[in-house]
Design a protein with these regions (language model features):
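Single conserved hydrophobic/aromatic residue that forms the stacking wall/gate
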Residues: 118-127
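Intrinsically disordered/low-complexity terminal segments and short unstructured peptides
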Residues: 36, 93, 122-123
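Small-residue (G/A/S/T)-rich helix-start motifs and N-terminal tracts that mark the onset
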Residues: 1-76
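Conserved beta-alpha-beta core of the PfkB/ribokinase-like small-molecule kinase fold
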Residues: 79, 83-119
C-alpha cells in the first residue's frame, strides 16, 4: 500500500518510546503516511524521569533535514524538541530555504516525567 503522504519529523529521541520521535513515527505510520526523521537530541529516560539529554550538533540536524528534502521530499513537517537555540535557528533557516509548507510546531518546554525546562519563552522569542 502506497503511503498517503510523507512527513518529516524533527524531534528528540525518547528511549522509552512513549514520546518524541518514536511516538511521532508510530502516529504518522498509523495514519497511513511515511515518516522520515531528523534527530535533534538523544535522551536517557523512562516512565519515571529523564536522566540525561544529549543535543545533536545543529550542523548534523541541518544535514539530516537537507538529505531528506533533497531526495525523498516531504508533504509536511512536524517539529518537536529542538533543545537549544542553535538548533532552533538551523531548523528555521533550513525549512525557510526549502520553502517548507504544512509545518506543525509542537515544542517541548517541560518533560512530563520531571520538571526539566528546555528553553524559556524569552529565548524562543529571540529567534
Amino acid at each position: 500500500m502506497k503511503p498517503k503522504s510523507k512527513v518529516l519529523i524533527i524531534a528528540g529521541s525518547d528511549s522509552s518510546g512513549g514520546a518524541g520521535i518514536q511516538a511521532d513515527i508510530k502516529t504518522v505510520t498509523a495514519l497511513g503516511s511515511y515518516a522520515t526523521t531528523a534527530v535533534t537530541a538523544v535522551t536517557a529516560q523512562n516512565t519515571k524521569g529523564v536522566k540525561k539529554i544529549i543535543s545533536i550538533p545543529s550542523e548534523i540536524v541541518q544535514k539530516q533535514i537537507t538529505m531528506i528534502l533533497d531526495d525523498i521530499g516531504t508533504h509536511a513537517v512536524k517539529i518537536g524538541m529542538l533543545h537549544n537555540t542553535d538548533t532552533i535557528k538551523s531548523v528555521y533557516k533550513t525549512l525557510k530555504r526549502y520553502k517548507s509548507k504544512n509545518v506543525v510546531l509542537d515544542p517541548v518546554m517541560i518533560a512530563k516525567a520531571v520538571s526539566y525546562t528546555h528553553l524559556t519563552l524569552p529565548t524562543i522569542l529571540l529567534v
